[in-house]
């Protein structure tokens, strides 16, 4: 995931600019106003999950295709956060989401009572459109994100928002990725549009061009509305 104009200075293959190696240990930087900033248990799990992403991205593409994504460690409280979100958002989706989203959400069959592991969801998605989901530690450079799309890979976070703010997250989390994106990636036309964005970004040569393309992606595929049966 990335923002509409993330002009970070790291190399474009950097997995996540917020993940640091400190004294040989993986450390996720959180802003002081982040809901989980003072929660040592939450931060420890975030670091462990970030390590999964870093080690995954050290492998070659061929290696990643032949291996399963390691399971992320989730607590009972975090499973409860997922359950609370699903309870609230499911009826909202039934009322407002488009037909294709609802059809593919049913095919995915995301559990209501626990956070699904990225590997199990990715396997189902791959059967639908050939797209796979692979882990990243957090926000990534737009070119990193788009180049993955060209290879039918959607980079996804595995951590979940803090339990003190279950209906808000300051960063894309596993709810955002799996509930927000995966169902639509199961729509063939939508999947191909993502691939085209990725191929277009592979032709960009400047940071300004990358950010302009990222803004188009942000307001077309990340956020947007559609007209269906005469209603928006």
Task: Mark where each language-model region is.
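The feature captures two recurrent sequence modes
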Residues: 1-185
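A contiguous, surface-oriented mixed alpha/beta subdomain in the mid-to-C-terminal portion of proteins
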Residues: 161-232
